[in-house]
């Protein structure tokens, strides 16, 4: 083959390979998990703040989380409930928006948090102590609400929901 025909053949393969990746990504997104919806309240020294949440309870839901979302309402989030306290590590793979993460104990108390997780990062974000759940919210929410270790997340899962 000449250099030109080799170049065209490589270009054609690259385009076909790229199309296959796009088709696979589209198929993967078409099979995204769905999430039950709920409400919770974050209580800090600044007050009580209601949030509309989605619940990630199954392994497929937890693996997907907020991946591929382009936006999240200011008073929205996702609660990952692992059922019992354990070491938890999260990452931001395929997550397009920066997030804050609150790590929560059985009683709803915040035991740790991570602010401004970087979109698309593969770095592990780990709890310093075992936690039962993780609440993901928009980056800046922890600072805006003044969240501190020991603050309370009220939700039926923790047996402390507010009426």
Predicted regions and their residues:
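Compact, glycine-rich, soluble single-domain proteins
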Residues: 31-163
């Amino acid at each position: 083959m000449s250099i030109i025909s080799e170049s065209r053949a490589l270009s054609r393969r690259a385009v076909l390979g790229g199309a296959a990746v796009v088709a696979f990504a589209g198929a993967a997104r078409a099979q995204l998990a769905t999430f039950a919806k709920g409400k919770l309240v974050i209580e800090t020294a600044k007050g009580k703040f209601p949030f509309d949440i989605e619940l990630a309870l199954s392994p497929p839901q937890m693996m997907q989380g907020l991946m591929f979302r382009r936006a999240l309402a200011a008073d929205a989030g996702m609660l990952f409930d692992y059922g019992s306290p354990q070491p938890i590590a999260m990452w931001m793979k395929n997550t397009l928006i920066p997030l804050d993460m609150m790590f929560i104990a059985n009683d709803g108390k915040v035991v740790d948090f991570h602010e401004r997780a970087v979109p698309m990062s593969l770095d592990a974000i780990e709890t310093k102590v075992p936690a039962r759940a993780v609440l993901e919210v928009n980056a800046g929410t922890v600072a805006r609400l003044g969240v501190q270790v020991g603050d309370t997340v009220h939700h039926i899962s923790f047996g402390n929901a507010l009426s």
